[in-house]
Amino acid sequence: MKNKLPPFIEIYRALIATPSISATEEALDQSNADLITLLADWFKDLGFNVEVQPVPGTRNKFNMLASTGQGAGGLLLAGHTDTVPFDDGRWTRDPFTLTEHDGKLYGLGTADMKGFFAFILDALRDVDVTKLKKPLYILATADEETSMAGARYFAETTALRPDCAIIGEPTSLQPVRAHKGHISNAIRIQGQSGHSSDPARGVNAIELMHDAIGHILQLRDNLKERYHYEAFTVPYPTLNLGHIHGGDASNRICAWCELHMDIRPLPGMTLNELNGLLNDALAPVSERWPGRLTVDELHPPIPGYECPPNHQLVEVVEKLLGAKTEVVNYCTEAPFIQTLCPTLVLGPGSINQAHQPDEYLETRFIKPTRELITQVIHHFCWH
């Protein structure tokens, strides 16, 4: 029953107080099971049907889908339940205690983005879900901050095809319809060690990597020349050499060298296309030194994303907000949800607060966010 639902600020407080950190390091990684249970119980109290989905390949992580209404289409509101780890020495407040001060709500996940579920639940107090003409879905995912495993698995397995979706990442309530993707690779070269007094008796991995880097930088230039999307601040795919290590002593021929790099592709560029371009760029080195160069993914790749600018979702949201949709450089789960239906990224709080100590959400977002959620539910589920 709706009268069992706690007040907005108490929902927010409970979400922040329930740790759900995602990390690649096992010692820091946490299950989101307790948070999913909280959300599931609240949505059941509102009359939703709730399904909890274990996410394979994770450390006890779950998705939750709450649904109400019948028929095809409808609206999907989505967000992730996890947060990044926190640096205790840089926080001046308890990350797991919601603190209100000077027009701000402080806590880990206030902006990015557990707080979004408090807004949804609060808005639903005034919605008679028994009168919806189209279904309403609420999706809570796992592991967005690391592998995006929750959104990937949900998109791969669901038969759901809503009319549209909104992901409540912190965009300062400015609608986002496109972003770049992210691919990170390790280029590894196996040389042959030996004494530096006789270089010809070994294979210097640093020298081979020097050759490989030349070809990678040529690929960077080619990407800049061939691909353009003028709406982006940086209107071409970027390629960055981020980390390199090789060798262990000045008097030894280097037997191993490793380079970490990333590419941020534009919407419309496929992951297979990018992998092909990278492998083609490195082919001269691989052919000259068979078996010595490998390319491995550091993280699961994220494709670029774009919602059609003429879709009804874009038109409706732009009219409601009085603001045009934007494109951004950071990544979200939108590429995976977009495989199900046209998707926008739109939520309270600033992306500048994401992953920061003393993360906060400004209270000025509370009223307009609640109103926006109510309006989009009315438009897409009642009309």
From Swiss-Prot:
Encoding gene (name): argE
Top EC group: hydrolase
GO molecular function: acetylornithine deacetylase activity; zinc ion binding
Gene3D superfamilies in alphabetical order: 3.30.70.360, Zn peptidases
Similarity comment text for this entry: Belongs to the peptidase M20A family. ArgE subfamily.
Enzymatic reactions: N(2)-acetyl-L-ornithine + H2O = L-ornithine + acetate
Name listed for the protein in its UniProt record: Acetylornithine deacetylase
Species this chain originates from: Escherichia coli O157:H7
An annotated GO BP: L-arginine biosynthetic process
Entry cofactors: Zn(2+); Co(2+); glutathione
UniProt-annotated catalytic positions: D82, E144
InterPro entries in the record: AcOrn-deacetyl, ArgE/DapE_CS, Bact_exopeptidase_dim_dom, Peptidase_M20, Peptidase_M20_dimer, Peptidase_M20A
PROSITE patterns membership: ARGE_DAPE_CPG2_1, ARGE_DAPE_CPG2_2
Cofactor note (record): Binds 2 Zn(2+) or Co(2+) ions per subunit.
NCBIfam families cross-referenced by the UniProt entry: AcOrn-deacetyl, PRK05111.1
Residues holding Zn(2+) 1: H80, D112, E169
HAMAP family per the UniProt record, alphabetical: ArgE
Pfam families: M20_dimer, Peptidase_M20
Keywords assigned by UniProt, alphabetized: Amino-acid biosynthesis, Arginine biosynthesis, Cobalt, Cytoplasm, Hydrolase, Metal-binding, Zinc
Sites where the protein binds Zn(2+) 2: D112, E145, H355
Pathway stated in the Swiss-Prot or TrEMBL entry: Amino-acid biosynthesis; L-arginine biosynthesis; L-ornithine from N(2)-acetyl-L-ornithine (linear): step 1/1
CDD domains, A to Z: M20_ArgE (cd03894)
